[in-house]
């Protein structure tokens, strides 16, 4: 938790399972990042106010068996709407960028390798 309080940003790398992030990531956020009033958040009359405002930006890299366009348009776009716009904001993280490799179950090794190289070359600004 001390490292989170002094970091400038955070990177999440996770699959999308059943239209959401896995329970293990939710548990990490629940037990580590929100482990008590005043550590990473404050409970107010209007809800949770995030205290990790030092984290200027988050990057979320995901994979999904569904195509990205389908996930964003038909499936409800839950990574953006819930994980980024709600969960991360409740922790105090105001800016986040999401990159998804969709249709991964039909991707070749060459396509997966290309995606990893593309991720490595992305400029991550914190």
Spans of features found by a protein language model:
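Helix-loop-strand module that forms the ligand-binding subsite of alpha/beta enzymes
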Residues: 1-81
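Glycine-rich phosphate/pyrophosphate-binding loop and the adjoining helix
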Residues: 70-126
